[in-house]
Regions:
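Ferredoxin-type iron-sulfur electron-transfer modules and their immediate structural context
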Residues: 1-75
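Iron-sulfur-cluster electron-transfer modules
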Residues: 21, 30, 60-260
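Short, intrinsically disordered, charge-balanced linker/junction segments flanking boundaries
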Residues: 261-267
């Protein structure tokens, strides 16, 4: 059994987390942990990867084992799926704690996570697709759609002011799977939907949710909110991507003002 040296503990660690915790819940909700182990039972990686035990992670946070938490593997091996919170009787937002630690305590993100966030900040989308390539892909898929359904009036509208729905794409659909673009447009056409997409900011994905970068997350959400206002649409529709839906639905309440985020989001 490992020895815990009390002199090495930093009791203020929980307060440091609470001060920067982007959440709609009690910022100290993790202090409600009962150590019951339901989170560990829910975690898909518990006992599969070393250190992947949410219950132990929370205990380390509460005890103030700051260095062990920051240098451990848990914060980066966690997928932030939220299964632990779903089963937690106290609703402790473990994924939110992981996200907060990733982005606010000087730990370096592994692999290309930060690169993806930087791409989205610098180019408008996380795969650095140029506006020219994006618009050409939409035009190409519009032509394919017209040919397939034998209707020259079928459209993939761009920057249509006053449409009911503003649709956000996954950059992978644009870059690697353009047939998905055609399929979505076909559904919209068959439904008779009054919809559009933006020529400027159209990326549904939001990797600031995973990196813990609140500043980046705010910028990305504001860009989408500006498109909603600019195009005067009623609803925002997000392509099939779980984290993108969460980022738009939950994120706009956290990172935007009530006025900026006053629009419904559908998936």
């Amino acid at each position: 059994m490992a020895v815990i040296r009390t002199k090495a503990l930093e009791p203020k660690f929980r307060q440091e987390i609470a001060q920067v915790f982007a959440t709609l819940q009690d910022k100290l909700d993790f202090s409600h942990c009962l150590a019951c182990g339901m989170c560990s039972a829910a975690c898909a990686f518990s006992d599969v990867h070393e250190e992947m035990d949410p219950r132990k992670f929370i205990r380390k946070v509460l005890l103030g084992m700051k260095e062990e938490v920051l240098n451990g593997q848990f914060i980066w091996n966690c997928s932030m799926c939220g299964r632990c919170t779903m089963l937690c009787p106290m609703g402790v937002d473990i994924a939110g704690i992981v996200r907060t630690i990733r982005g606010n305590f000087g730990v370096k993100s592994p692999g290309f996570l930060q690169e993806v966030v930087d791409n989205q900040l610098n180019t408008g989308n996380q795969m650095a697709v140029s506006q020219e390539d994006y618009l050409e892909t939409l035009e190409w898929m519009e032509e394919e759609l017209q040919a397939e359904i034998a209707d020259p009036k079928a459209r993939i509208p761009v920057d249509k002011v006053g449409a009911d729905f503003l649709f956000l794409w996954d950059p992978r659909e644009i870059k690697y799977y353009p047939q998905d673009v055609q399929s979505i447009a076909k559904i919209m056409h068959a439904a008779g939907a009054n919809w559009t997409c933006s020529s400027e900011y159209w990326d549904a994905t939001h990797y600031g949710l995973f990196s813990g970068d609140d500043e980046a997350s705010t910028i990305l959400l504001k860009r989408i909110a500006q498109q909603v206002k600019k195009l005067k649409v009623q609803y925002l529709v997000v392509t099939e991507c779980g984290h993108a839906t969460r980022a738009q639905r939950w994120g706009r309440k956290v990172w935007l003002s009530p006025e900026e985020g006053d629009y419904p989001v559908y998936n």
